[in-house]
């Protein structure tokens, strides 16, 4: 299974810590074989793993860019496009037992937070209009209507 995320350095150091914590947890997940990280600057990430594949770009990728990358580079594989602040657990194994052909799952998250930057709490995120990860098997159809980036208000529901 392939995880595809966008990574960038936020001006908020606590937020950067959250992104790195989530990345570290996902790299430790045995169900995730590869993590494809779309980034604008290769020097932004300060640790390495054989699972990490950096895709350096001059600009932020749109959803269409991410889905087309999966179609072209990860043919006939399960892909998980997710926000950088998402951690996956062993429930990903559920998708390995499904016929994922022409299926597309949009999932919301559980919220993680910290008050001191060291101790993290995890709780359900209560917002029915939120999706933070998209799981599918390539190929999937794409269109120009997907030309918007992650992290923009309302992007989850387009």
What annotation goes with each model-predicted range?
Residues 1-5, 26, 34-37:
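Hydrophobic targeting segments
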């Amino acid at each position: 299974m392939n995880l595809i995320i966008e990574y960038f350095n936020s001006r908020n150091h606590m937020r950067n810590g959250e992104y790195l914590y989530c990345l570290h947890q996902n790299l430790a997940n045995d169900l995730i074989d590869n993590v494809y990280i779309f980034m604008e600057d290769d020097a932004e990430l300060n640790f390495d793993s054989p699972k990490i594949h950096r895709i350096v770009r001059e600009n932020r990728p749109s959803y269409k860019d991410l889905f087309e990358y999966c179609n072209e580079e990860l043919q006939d594989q399960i892909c998980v496009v997710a926000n950088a602040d998402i951690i996956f657990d062993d429930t990903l194994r559920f998708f390995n037992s499904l016929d994922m052909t022409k299926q597309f799952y949009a999932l919301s998250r559980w919220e993680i937070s910290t008050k001191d930057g060291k101790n993290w709490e995890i709780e359900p995120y209560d917002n029915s209009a939120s999706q933070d990860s998209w799981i599918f098997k390539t190929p999937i159809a794409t269109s120009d209507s997907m030309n918007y980036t992650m992290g923009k208000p309302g992007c989850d529901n387009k």
